[in-house]
């Protein structure tokens, strides 16, 4: 834009505006896939048998609390308030690459599952050695459960269920860490048709 302004409005001579040659890529469409209740049961069942003792808790953290994989791997016991059911997420990054800290709520079953885990030497709750290792265990679990969805779908599942339970948009954004509400609206747009039909019916 600055180059075009200089050429068009200020009559500055430049051989060409190279910026105009850059193709602007369209943002990929959000798939909106959510994990069904039956799929959740199957995933948690097989996660309980995984060599990764933390996998069941990780799936719950995604579905119940909307944590990103990186946030799970960075979560430490010292940042969890077991009495208040909250966790402080430190140095998390949103899509704008701005580093932030935020405090989120944890579900009762997440609290109970975390309490069952063996304490690690480095204080982390989800002790995956890397993102790749995390996804390898997830792939094994989802294949055994007969589920084809990505782990990121756990966050979409949280958003959809929260919307169905009449959470306010700002509350969901605070929990998920979304800075762009328009991105979050995409999750809302994928609500199940049966649920929306019932909402309309109740308006009558």
Describe the predicted segments one by one.
Residues 1-4, 11-15, 29, 50-53, ...:
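N-terminal core-binding DNA-recognition domain of tyrosine site-specific recombinases/integrases
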Residues 1-7, 22, 106:
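Non-catalytic DNA-binding core/recognition domains of DNA-processing enzymes
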Residues 4-17, 60-84, 170, 174:
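Short, charged phosphate-coordinating catalytic segments
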Residues 13-69, 73, 155:
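Basic, Lys/Arg- and aromatic-enriched nucleic-acid-binding interface segment
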Residues 20-23, 27, 39, 74-116:
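Conserved tyrosine-mediated DNA breakage-rejoining catalytic core shared by Y-recombinases
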Residues 48-55, 119-125, 135-174, 181-182:
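Short, basic (Lys/Arg/His-rich) helix/loop patches that form interaction surfaces
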Residues 95-140, 145:
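C-terminal catalytic core of Y-nucleophile DNA break-rejoin enzymes
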């Amino acid at each position: 834009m600055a180059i075009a302004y200089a050429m068009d409005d200020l009559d500055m001579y430049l051989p060409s505006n190279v910026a105009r040659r850059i193709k602007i890529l369209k943002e990929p469409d959000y798939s909106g896939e959510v994990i069904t209740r039956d799929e959740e049961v199957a995933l948690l069942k097989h996660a309980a048998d995984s060599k990764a003792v933390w996998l069941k808790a990780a799936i719950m953290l995604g579905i119940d609390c909307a944590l990103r994989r990186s946030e799970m791997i960075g979560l430490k016991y010292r940042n969890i308030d077991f009495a208040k059911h909250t966790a402080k997420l430190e140095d998390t990054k949103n899509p704008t690459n701005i580093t932030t800290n935020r405090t989120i709520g944890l579900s009762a079953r997440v609290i109970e599952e975390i309490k069952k885990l063996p304490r690690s030497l480095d204080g982390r709750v989800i002790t995956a050695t890397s993102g790749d290792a995390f996804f390898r265990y997830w792939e094994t679990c989802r294949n055994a459960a007969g589920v084809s969805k990505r782990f990121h779908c756990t966050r979409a599942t949280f958003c959809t269920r929260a919307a169905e339970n009449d959470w306010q948009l700002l509350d969901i954004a605070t929990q998920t860490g979304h800075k762009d509400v328009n991105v979050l609206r995409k999750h809302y747009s994928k609500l199940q048709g049966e649920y929306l039909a019932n909402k309309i019916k109740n308006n009558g």
